[in-house]
Amino acid sequence: MSPDKSYERKIKIIMLQSQLQSIVEKFAVSATVSTIRPLGSGLINDTYLVVTEEKDQPDYVLQRINHEVFPDVDMVMRNIAIVTRHIRERLIAQGETDLRHHVLEFLPTVEDANRLYAEVDGHYWRLMVFIDHAVTKQEVNPESAHAAGQSFGHFQAMLADVPCQLGETIKDFHNMEFRIEQLKQACVEDRAGRFDEPAVQELLEQLGKRAEAMTEAERLGREGKLPKRVCHCDTKVNNMLFSEDGSEVLCVIDLDTVMPSFIFSDYGDFLRTAASTAAEDEPDFSKIQFRQDVFQAFTKGYLASARSFLTPLEIQMLPYAVVLFPYMQSVRFLWDYLNGDGYWKVQYPTHNLVRAQNQFELVKRVEEAMPAIKAFINSQLN
């Protein structure tokens, strides 16, 4: 790097530090900021570690909220405030003293003690306490799947008695009836001229045969037989913080999607990705199998934590949840393909069609495994 370019880079870093410092100062921070640096991959640089000088003060995480995905930032942060406050109260009641490592803590702004985000130049920022001596995991194996089941089940259990209603941060996110109506509308409009393709017609026929069964949750919900609960709605193994030695799950993170939903959102969506042997865009469908080891480990952990508050009908419908989410994702990928690939990024013209076919192949693998799935769940109830 030439001296001139090196100097320019240093100036840009100094300017960025100054801008970020001014954002941090909008929050009620009592510590002195030492440095601010990107946290995570650094590809987007929307998350920063705020290092403080004082040894008795925590470091912080400064994060920009993606208001394109979550346009109602106030609702997102209100939900998070309700959830984290309730978890903190439950942990205290259980005798937990190390709250810092077991629940996220967001700082209020200087101007408003009840507001947990600041608006700066049309962008929205929040500041939370950094949880040290913690790591995330990417690999899904039976051990991490069991930990995930326990953690997300415990998360739901702690929030089963939240006294106030949370908002829906992404409307109809896991509403199967809505997703099917979206697909029907895409077929009528046929924006990309793909409706008559043989592969599309074949997949539509197979999805249509299962549509009534896959919308059972919405029907039971309207009849008052199936409750909506506070769910995480983005259950992935990397949305948990583990202790450094990996022996303990400390905290569930990434709470932007926390909202009311059927419990299947957290149970089924985790298994959709974690229990498949192939990525969701793998074109060789022979590589797609349903991992019984991951399913059993996750289910065992989940029921150990969640069984105490689940209704008999919710438990009875857990097998339905396992097939629901790959089905839903197949519908959503096909919808995007028919609409001209405007939602998910694609690498080639039929990418979304392959994704839709891939997820439907997983549906078939789950259907084949259904007797074993039901038998294992029943074995955990005895």
Q: Which residue stretches match the model-derived regions?
A:
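Protein kinase-like catalytic core scaffold
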Residues: 60, 102, 126, 229, ...
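Juxta-kinase regulatory segment immediately upstream of eukaryotic protein kinase catalytic domains
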Residues: 13-36
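Activation of the activation-loop gatekeeper triad in protein kinase-fold domains
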Residues: 253-258
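ATP-dependent phospho-/nucleotidyl transfer catalytic cores
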Residues: 37-41, 63-74, 131-146, 161-232, ...
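All-alpha amphipathic helical-bundle segments outside canonical DNA-binding/catalytic cores
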Residues: 143, 310-322
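Active-site activation/catalytic loop segments of kinase-like enzymes and analogous catalytic loops
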Residues: 260, 264-307, 324-343
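N-terminal amphipathic/basic-hydrophobic helices that include classical n-h-c signal peptides
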Residues: 1-14
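Conserved ATP-binding subdomain of kinase catalytic cores across diverse folds
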Residues: 36-39, 43-184, 188, 263, ...
